[in-house]
Regions:
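Short, functionally important secondary-structure microenvironments
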Residues: 1-102, 108-188
Length: 188
């Protein structure tokens, strides 16, 4: 991270690098990793110092792991200590800064609401259909809550286009009535 780089400048640099990224250029990859990790450190500090939210404190207790090969934007691995915030920086870094903050908070809320353990409990056989349905339900629960918060004090974040909400579940499954701001159990 360049000395004195602010979060917006570093985010812009990460996004510019994504557009020209080459897996074959080891020096570029090294610089990109450094910049992305620096950006992530600034995200932690922003969430703590500017927003005094538990999200930043949660991130401080985690290790960042970058996976350039993953198809997933981000996730949290709880089977390691300290827990790992796993991200594909080429995907996560391409979002706007407000969307990136939303995604980080989204992943943390899955842990706060114990969704990983609940998924294992409800789907011990690892059925992929149940896994997908659980993810939809858990995402709707988390995103509705984040959207409700973002109307006020949490306006520093913005839901990415296409994110799952109770409204999108209503449309996807042709439901006549569905309540917002419910737990995953309601949507599952």
């Amino acid at each position: 991270m360049a000395p004195g780089a602010d979060i917006a400048t570093l985010h812009d640099r990460v996004r510019e690098t994504i557009g020209a990224f080459s897996f074959d250029d080891r020096q570029q990859r090294s610089i990109f990793e450094r910049d992305f990790k620096g950006l992530f450190d600034l995200v932690k500090l922003f969430l703590i110092s500017e927003r005094d939210s538990y999200y930043g404190y949660f991130l401080m207790a985690m290790k960042l792991e970058l996976d350039f090969e993953s198809n997933a934007v981000a996730g949290i691995k709880l089977n390691e200590y300290p827990p790992v915030f796993l991200a594909n920086p080429l995907i996560l870094g391409a979002f706007s800064l407000k969307e990136m903050l939303y995604i980080v908070c989204h992943e943390i809320d899955h842990v706060v609401f114990n969704h990983p353990a609940e998924m294992v409990r409800l789907n011990p056989e690892g059925d992929p259909v149940k896994y997908e349905l659980f993810n939809l339900a858990a995402d709707a629960s988390v995103n509705d809550r984040l959207n409700d918060e973002s109307c006020g004090i949490q306006s520093f974040m913005e839901m990415p286009q296409g994110a799952i909400t109770s409204d999108s579940l209503k449309q996807r499954f042709g439901l006549k009535r569905i309540l917002p701001l419910q737990s995953y159990r309601y949507y599952y």
